[in-house]
C-alpha cells in the first residue's frame, strides 16, 4: 500500500531530459535524488565610480570566497539588504556578469553546461509576463518557444494543463494577467503564472529571486507551500528571501546566511538556531528565527549585547567591544569557518566527482535554442499583435485621434483655392502633415523600453534570438501602428483639402506620409533602444525633431543658409517629406487666375509666383522625376540606418546583471 509521499521511480532518460550532468549511471533513480548544485570559492568584485567632479573607479567586493552545496529541496538564501543574496543567486544561475567573477559552480560535480540558463528555471523578482494575454496564452508562448518543435501540440497542451492544475490556476486560466489599464488576476496568481512559465521545460533546478516580494503574508505562505510541494518531487529550488515569517521559515530545508558578501551560515535550516546558540547568540522565546538572524547580523539584537557581556566577563578581554556592524559579521564569518557544519560541508564538496578539478568561471555564453528563426518570428509577431489588440489605449485610441485630427485640419484648410492664399495654405498644411507624422511617431520609443526587462529575461532563458524578437516586433507592432494612421489621415484629408485630383498624386501623398512615419519611428527606436526611462528618449526625440523642422524648407529658405550649416538639411526627416509633398502637389499647378501655364510669359508682377513650377524652383526643388523620388530614397536609406542602429544596440545590450 503506497502513499502520496512515496518516491516515484522515473527513467533517467525521461526525468533529466534537460541535458544536465547526472550523478550516476543507473538506469533509474528516484525523483528525490534530483540534481545537486555546488559552488566553490565564489568571489565577485565590481568596479564602481565615486566622486562628483573627479570620478574615481573603486573595486568593491560583493561576494567573498563563498562555498556551499544545494540539494533537492527548499534552499533559502537569507540576508540583510545589500548583503549579496541576489548576487549569489544570479551567480549560481549563470546570470551574472562574468567580469570580476571567480570560482566554480558545478552541477552534479560537473561544470555547468552551455545551455544551463535555458534548461534551468529562473523566476525574477518583478513578474515579467505579458499582462494583455491570459494565463494560458502566456504558458502557450513559453511552451511554443522553449519546447522542441518535434513535440506535438497536444503534448504541449497536456503539459500546460498539468501545470495549470498543479499551480491551482484553473479558475483564472483564461483570464488576462492584467496591466495598469486592465484589471487582471491577483498578485499570488501572477507569481504562480511566472513560476508556471519556468516549469514548462520541467527544470530540475529552479531559481527564484525573492518570490514573496509584494505579496501579503497569506499569499506568500501559499507560494512557499507550492514550492515545498515541488521540491518533494525532486526539484532543487534555490531562492533569495527577505525576512520570512516563521510558518515560511520552517519549510526551509537548507539555509544560507549572507552579510556584506560573507558567508555566516550554510547548512540545514533546522540546525541554525542551535548553531547560533553555540556561537553565544540565543534566540528569545517566541521570536521569529529569521528576524533573529537578521538582528544578530545587523548588530541590533539584545542577543548581541548579551553575547558581548558574556565574552567580556568570561574571557576578561581588554579590548573594547566594537559597536559597528562589521566586527559582528567578521566574528560570525570566522566562527562559521571553524565550525563543524562548515567541516561537513567542505567534506561533502570534496567528495563530489570533479570537485578537485579547477574549471574556472566560464564566460557568458549565448543561449541554445530549440526552435528555428521563423518559428520564433511567428510566435513573437502573434504575441505582439495580440498585445496590440488587447491594449486599446495604444491602438484604438491612436486611430480615433487620427480621424478627429484629420477632420479638424480638413475643416481649417477646407477646399483650398488656386490663388496666392491657396498656395500659402497648401505649403502650410503640407508642412503640418509632415511634422505631425514625425511627432506622432514619438510613441515608438516605448516599443523596446517598456518590454526591456521582459526581453532580457526571455532572451537569457532561451526563448528566442535577438533577430527574431527585433523583426517580430517591427512587423507586428511598428508597421501597422504607423501604416494605418497614415492611410486614414490621407483618406480623410486629401479630398477635404481639395488637393490635386489625380490618382497618382493621391497615392504618392499616402506613400510619402507612410515613409515619413516609418523613418521617424525608426529614429525613435535607434534613440530609445537600451534606455530604461521613456521620458529621456522622448525628450531627445522632441529636441531632434525641433531642429529638423528648422531645415524642412518652410521656416527658412534652404538656399539662404550658410554653407557651414546647410549640410544639416540632409539629416532632416521633415525636409524630405515636405519636399516630396510639395513636388507632388505643386508641379504643373496654376495659381494666377487667367494665367496660361503653357505660355512662356511671366506675370505682370515680376515678384509674384503664378505657377507651381515657379514655386518649386524658388524652393530649390528639381522639376525632374528624380526631384520627387530622391526624397523617398533618402528616407528609405535613413530607415535602414536607424533600424540597423536599433538592432545593434539591442544585440549588444547588457543582458546580465
Swiss-Prot record:
<dbReference type="GO" id="GO:0032218">
    <property type="term" value="P:riboflavin transport"/>
</dbReference>
<feature type="binding site">
    <location>
        <position position="242"/>
    </location>
    <ligand>
        <name>ATP</name>
    </ligand>
</feature>
<feature type="binding site">
    <location>
        <begin position="79"/>
        <end position="86"/>
    </location>
    <ligand>
        <name>ATP</name>
    </ligand>
</feature>
<keyword id="KW-0812">Transmembrane</keyword>
<feature type="binding site">
    <location>
        <position position="210"/>
    </location>
    <ligand>
        <name>ATP</name>
    </ligand>
</feature>
<keyword id="KW-1003">Cell membrane</keyword>
<feature type="topological domain" description="Extracellular">
    <location>
        <begin position="499"/>
        <end position="506"/>
    </location>
</feature>
<feature type="compositionally biased region" description="Polar residues">
    <location>
        <begin position="13"/>
        <end position="24"/>
    </location>
</feature>
<dbReference type="InterPro" id="IPR043926">
    <property type="entry name" value="ABCG_dom"/>
</dbReference>
<feature type="binding site">
    <location>
        <begin position="183"/>
        <end position="189"/>
    </location>
    <ligand>
        <name>ATP</name>
    </ligand>
</feature>
<feature type="disulfide bond">
    <location>
        <begin position="592"/>
        <end position="610"/>
    </location>
</feature>
<comment type="subunit">
    <text>Homodimer; disulfide-linked. The minimal functional unit is a homodimer, but the major oligomeric form in plasma membrane is a homotetramer with possibility of higher order oligomerization up to homododecamers.</text>
</comment>
<feature type="topological domain" description="Cytoplasmic">
    <location>
        <begin position="1"/>
        <end position="393"/>
    </location>
</feature>
<feature type="topological domain" description="Extracellular">
    <location>
        <begin position="557"/>
        <end position="632"/>
    </location>
</feature>
<dbReference type="InterPro" id="IPR003593">
    <property type="entry name" value="AAA+_ATPase"/>
</dbReference>
<dbReference type="GO" id="GO:0045121">
    <property type="term" value="C:membrane raft"/>
</dbReference>
<feature type="region of interest" description="Disordered">
    <location>
        <begin position="1"/>
        <end position="24"/>
    </location>
</feature>
<keyword id="KW-0597">Phosphoprotein</keyword>
<dbReference type="Pfam" id="PF01061">
    <property type="entry name" value="ABC2_membrane"/>
</dbReference>
<dbReference type="GO" id="GO:0031966">
    <property type="term" value="C:mitochondrial membrane"/>
</dbReference>
<feature type="transmembrane region" description="Helical">
    <location>
        <begin position="536"/>
        <end position="556"/>
    </location>
</feature>
<protein>
    <recommendedName>
        <fullName>Broad substrate specificity ATP-binding cassette transporter ABCG2</fullName>
        <ecNumber>7.6.2.2</ecNumber>
    </recommendedName>
</protein>
<dbReference type="GO" id="GO:0042626">
    <property type="term" value="F:ATPase-coupled transmembrane transporter activity"/>
</dbReference>
<keyword id="KW-0496">Mitochondrion</keyword>
<feature type="domain" description="ABC transporter">
    <location>
        <begin position="48"/>
        <end position="285"/>
    </location>
</feature>
<feature type="transmembrane region" description="Helical">
    <location>
        <begin position="633"/>
        <end position="653"/>
    </location>
</feature>
<dbReference type="InterPro" id="IPR027417">
    <property type="entry name" value="P-loop_NTPase"/>
</dbReference>
<keyword id="KW-0813">Transport</keyword>
<feature type="glycosylation site" description="N-linked (GlcNAc...) asparagine">
    <location>
        <position position="600"/>
    </location>
</feature>
<feature type="domain" description="ABC transmembrane type-2">
    <location>
        <begin position="389"/>
        <end position="653"/>
    </location>
</feature>
<feature type="transmembrane region" description="Helical">
    <location>
        <begin position="394"/>
        <end position="414"/>
    </location>
</feature>
<dbReference type="GO" id="GO:0097744">
    <property type="term" value="P:renal urate salt excretion"/>
</dbReference>
<dbReference type="InterPro" id="IPR003439">
    <property type="entry name" value="ABC_transporter-like_ATP-bd"/>
</dbReference>
<dbReference type="GO" id="GO:0016887">
    <property type="term" value="F:ATP hydrolysis activity"/>
</dbReference>
<dbReference type="GO" id="GO:0015225">
    <property type="term" value="F:biotin transmembrane transporter activity"/>
</dbReference>
<keyword id="KW-0325">Glycoprotein</keyword>
<keyword id="KW-1278">Translocase</keyword>
<keyword id="KW-1015">Disulfide bond</keyword>
<keyword id="KW-0067">ATP-binding</keyword>
<dbReference type="GO" id="GO:0055085">
    <property type="term" value="P:transmembrane transport"/>
</dbReference>
<keyword id="KW-0547">Nucleotide-binding</keyword>
<feature type="transmembrane region" description="Helical">
    <location>
        <begin position="478"/>
        <end position="498"/>
    </location>
</feature>
Amino acid at each position: 500500500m503506497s502513499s502520496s509521499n512515496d518516491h516515484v521511480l522515473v527513467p533517467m532518460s525521461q526525468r533529466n531530459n534537460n541535458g544536465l550532468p547526472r550523478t550516476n549511471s543507473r538506469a533509474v533513480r528516484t525523483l528525490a535524488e534530483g540534481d545537486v548544485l555546488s559552488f566553490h570559492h565564489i568571489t565577485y568584485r565590481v568596479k564602481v565610480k565615486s566622486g562628483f567632479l573627479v570620478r574615481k573607479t573603486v573595486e568593491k567586493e560583493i561576494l567573498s570566497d563563498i562555498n556551499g552545496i544545494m540539494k533537492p529541496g527548499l534552499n533559502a538564501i537569507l540576508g540583510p539588504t545589500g548583503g549579496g543574496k541576489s548576487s549569489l543567486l544570479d551567480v549560481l544561475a549563470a546570470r551574472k556578469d562574468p567580469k570580476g567573477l571567480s570560482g566554480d559552480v558545478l552541477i552534479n560535480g560537473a561544470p555547468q553546461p552551455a545551455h544551463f540558463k535555458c534548461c534551468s528555471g529562473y523566476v525574477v523578482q518583478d513578474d515579467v509576463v505579458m499582462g494583455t494575454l491570459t494565463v494560458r496564452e502566456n504558458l502557450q508562448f513559453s511552451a511554443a518557444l522553449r519546447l522542441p518543435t518535434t513535440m506535438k501540440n497536444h503534448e504541449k497542451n497536456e503539459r500546460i494543463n498539468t501545470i495549470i492544475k498543479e499551480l491551482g490556476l484553473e479558475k483564472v486560466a483564461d483570464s488576462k494577467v492584467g496591466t495598469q489599464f486592465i484589471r487582471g488576476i491577483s498578485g499570488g496568481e501572477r507569481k504562480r503564472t511566472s513560476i508556471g512559465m519556468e516549469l514548462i521545460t520541467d527544470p530540475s533546478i529552479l531559481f527564484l529571486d525573492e518570490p514573496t516580494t509584494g505579496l501579503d503574508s497569506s499569499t506568500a505562505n501559499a507560494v512557499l507551500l507550492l514550492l515545498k510541494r515541488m521540491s518533494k518531487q525532486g526539484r532543487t529550488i534555490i531562492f533569495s528571501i527577505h525576512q520570512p515569517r516563521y510558518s515560511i521559515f520552517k519549510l526551509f530545508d537548507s539555509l544560507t546566511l549572507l552579510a556584506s558578501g560573507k558567508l555566516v551560515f550554510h547548512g540545514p535550516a533546522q540546525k541554525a538556531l542551535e548553531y547560533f546558540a553555540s556561537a553565544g547568540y540565543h534566540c528569545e522565546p517566541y521570536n521569529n528565527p529569521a528576524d533573529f538572524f537578521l538582528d544578530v547580523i545587523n548588530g541590533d539584537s539584545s542577543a548581541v549585547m548579551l553575547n558581548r557581556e558574556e565574552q567580556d566577563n568570561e574571557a576578561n578581554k581588554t579590548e573594547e567591544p566594537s559597536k559597528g556592524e562589521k566586527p559582528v559579521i567578521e566574528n560570525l564569518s570566522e566562527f562559521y569557518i571553524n565550525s563543524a557544519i562548515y567541516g561537513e560541508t567542505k567534506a561533502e564538496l570534496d567528495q563530489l566527482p570533479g570537485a578537485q578539478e579547477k574549471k574556472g568561471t566560464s564566460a557568458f555564453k549565448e543561449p541554445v535554442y530549440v526552435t528555428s528563426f521563423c518559428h520564433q518570428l511567428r510566435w513573437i509577431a502573434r504575441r505582439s499583435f495580440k498585445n496590440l489588440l488587447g491594449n486599446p489605449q495604444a491602438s484604438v485610441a491612436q486611430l480615433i485621434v487620427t480621424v478627429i485630427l484629420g477632420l479638424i485640419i480638413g475643416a481649417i484648410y477646407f477646399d483650398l483655392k488656386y490663388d496666392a492664399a491657396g498656395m500659402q495654405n497648401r505649403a502650410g498644411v503640407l508642412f503640418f502633415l509632415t511634422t505631425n507624422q514625425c511627432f506622432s511617431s514619438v510613441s515608438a520609443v516605448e516599443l523596446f523600453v517598456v518590454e526591456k526587462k521582459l526581453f532580457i529575461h526571455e532572451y537569457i532563458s532561451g526563448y528566442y534570438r535577438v533577430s527574431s524578437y527585433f523583426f517580430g516586433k517591427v512587423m507586428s507592432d511598428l508597421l501597422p501602428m504607423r501604416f494605418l494612421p497614415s492611410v486614414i489621415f490621407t483618406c480623410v484629408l486629401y479630398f477635404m483639402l481639395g488637393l490635386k485630383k489625380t490618382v497618382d498624386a493621391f497615392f504618392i501623398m499616402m506613400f510619402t506620409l507612410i515613409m515619413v512615419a516609418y523613418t521617424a519611428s525608426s529614429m525613435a527606436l535607434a534613440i530609445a533602444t537600451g534606455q530604461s526611462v521613456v521620458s529621456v528618449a522622448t525628450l531627445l526625440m522632441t529636441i531632434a525633431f525641433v531642429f529638423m523642422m528648422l531645415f524642412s524648407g518652410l521656416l527658412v529658405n534652404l538656399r539662404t543658409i550658410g554653407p557651414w550649416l546647410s549640410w544639416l538639411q540632409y539629416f532632416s526627416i521633415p525636409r524630405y517629406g515636405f519636399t516630396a509633398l510639395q513636388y507632388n502637389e505643386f508641379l504643373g499647378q496654376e495659381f494666377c487666375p487667367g494665367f496660361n501655364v503653357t505660355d512662356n510669359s511671366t506675370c505682370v508682377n515680376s515678384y509674384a509666383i503664378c505657377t507651381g513650377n515657379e514655386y518649386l524652383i524658388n524652393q530649390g526643388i528639381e522639376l525632374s522625376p528624380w526631384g520627387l523620388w530622391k526624397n523617398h530614397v533618402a528616407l528609405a536609406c535613413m530607415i535602414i540606418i536607424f533600424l540597423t542602429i536599433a538592432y545593434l544596440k539591442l544585440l549588444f545590450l547588457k543582458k546580465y546583471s
